[in-house]
Design a protein with these regions (language model features):
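CN hydrolase (nitrilase-like) catalytic-core segments centered on the catalytic cysteine
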Residues: 59-80, 151-227
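Short amphipathic alpha-helical segment that frequently serves as the phosphate-/nucleotide-binding helix
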Residues: 15-25
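Short Pro/Gly-enriched beta-strand edge/turn motifs at strand-loop
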Residues: 78-84, 111-120, 192-195
Length: 232
């Protein structure tokens, strides 16, 4: 299976632009079977204000129009897509990462660490998930960790197959820094794919990496849009 790690620009609270970027990346991913995007992609990293009345309006449900558009794209281009979104489920809000294939959401991971919002002021409707179980996709055992999850609870993501690690990093992922991420990923899984979006506000320089046994095996440069295709 070939997996494309799409490091593309996303904009805060501009879902229309971000959906166009998703389609652009899918087209440019060529023969990838699955295209993965970084944390904060659909609504933008700073979209969460920790003001419940604002955030519940910003969040989207699995059957919302934006998610329906991504489902349509997965059908149109015959590719699976993994994308981060702020999810609304009834009165509750989650930081989630959906796997979409064939027009359906087939897996929906909810971040388990709490530092995606200002937890000192948010109410009980800002929720974390509890399920970190691996799942099978095209015969490959996979698990998903969202950004800080893997730094706080690495033992919860142990997997014999492949770790998908979408992040939002606002500092340089240079050789030294990416090496630290590779070592951290190895605490959970021998093979890991990290993808970081590009953003002007707040700043994120992008980049994508394939880690194996704590080492960087493949990478995509910073400050430019592109898709790193990895065969697993």
């Amino acid at each position: 299976m070939k997996i494309g790690l799409a490091s593309y620009e996303c904009r805060m609270n501009d879902i229309g632009f971000n959906l166009k970027q998703i389609e652009k990346a899918i087209v440019e991913s060529k023969d990838a079977d699955l295209v993965c995007f970084g944390e904060a992609f659909l609504q933008g990293f700073a979209a969460v204000t920790s003001d419940y009345e604002m955030d519940i309006k910003m969040a989207v449900e699995q059957d919302s129009l934006p998610v329906a558009k991504i489902r349509e794209l997965s059908l149109q281009y015959r590719k699976a897509v993994m994308v981060w979104y702020i999810e609304k489920d009834g009165p509750d809000i989650y930081s989630s990462y959906a796997l979409i294939e064939g027009g359906s959401v087939i897996h929906n991971y909810r971040r388990i660490s709490k530092n995606w919002k200002d937890y000192n002021i948010t109410n009980g409707n800002y929720r974390e998930g509890t399920d970190t179980s691996p799942f099978l996709f095209h015969g490959v055992e996979m698990t998903v960790a969202l950004c800080g999850d893997l730094w706080i609870y690495p033992e919860s993501f142990r997997c014999s197959g492949l770790l998908i690690w979408p992040v939002y990093v606002n500092f340089d992922l240079d050789e030294s820094e990416s090496g630290e991420y590779a070592k951290q990923a190895a605490m959970a899984c021998g093979k890991a794919l990290l993808v970081n979006p590009l953003s002007k506000e707040p700043i994120s320089r992008g980049g994508a990496f394939f880690f194996e046994n704590g080492k960087v095996k493949q990478s995509l440069g910073l400050d430019k849009e592109g898709v790193l295709v990895v065969e697993v």
